[in-house]
Amino acid sequence: MTLLDLSAFPNAQMLYPAAGVMMAYLITKKGDKNLPTAFYIFFVALTAVLVVCTAASVLAPQNRDLMSMPYSQWAPIMNYVIIGGSVIFWILLLQSGKEMRRSYGLNSEHWNISIRMILLFIGLYLLRFVIACALSGQLSEFGKIMANPTTWIIFFTVLVNFFLSVVAFFGEEYGWRYYLQPLLQKKFGLKGGVILLGCVWAVWHLPIDFFYYTTPDMGLAALASQFVTCISLG
């Protein structure tokens, strides 16, 4: 049996929530002067391109063996599309103007809080690592890691990579958190809305839980873990 590289599926799926919201707005709000039409049309078109690449990765896989694992030649193409799409994403987002961004949840009013949360996450992550090293009697190793230039190169690479792959992360956050979460919280309350959102978000992962993250026989276990993750992080 020929194995397929299914990595294209989650890459495309991450854009679906935001693309769905944008398509709805393009249809129902087309008379609104504050609608970021160009930005929305581009994102929907980008999603369509990734869907085509995903279908092609199955219909014309052109797989190669990479360390005994299937590697589709469509994988780098998908990466190029995401990187190029992210660059255009930033350009169109900035060109849309503050009023359009503010009207459709594309402009944060609390950057200072976001930066503080990022710094808090980094601080807690490092603290966890320091405690683990201290408990194992390897605290000196932490100092060596932090003094290694490679550590900082990787850190800044991850930072740059976020901006060059932002469309994937934006797809879920805009669709679920900006649009669906407030809608559910309005109908079912703050806690009920978050719990229901987590359930919907978890079920949304079902295809890749069964056919990408794990094998079908382990799909239910993966789906159960998604419920825990999506509800607790919601």
Which residues make up each language-model segment?
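Functionally important transmembrane alpha-helices
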Residues: 1, 191-202, 215-234
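Membrane-embedded glycan transfer/ligation machinery
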Residues: 13, 17, 173, 177-178, ...
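Membrane-interface helix/loop boundary segments of multi-pass membrane proteins
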Residues: 123, 170-198, 212
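Specific transmembrane helices
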Residues: 1-169
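Membrane-interface interhelical connector segments
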Residues: 138-149, 175, 180-182, 209-221
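Short, motif-level signal for alpha-helix interfacial/capping segments enriched in acidic residues
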Residues: 146-155, 182-186, 224-228, 232-233
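Hydrophobic transmembrane alpha-helices of Major Facilitator Superfamily
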Residues: 158-162, 166, 170-175, 203-206, ...
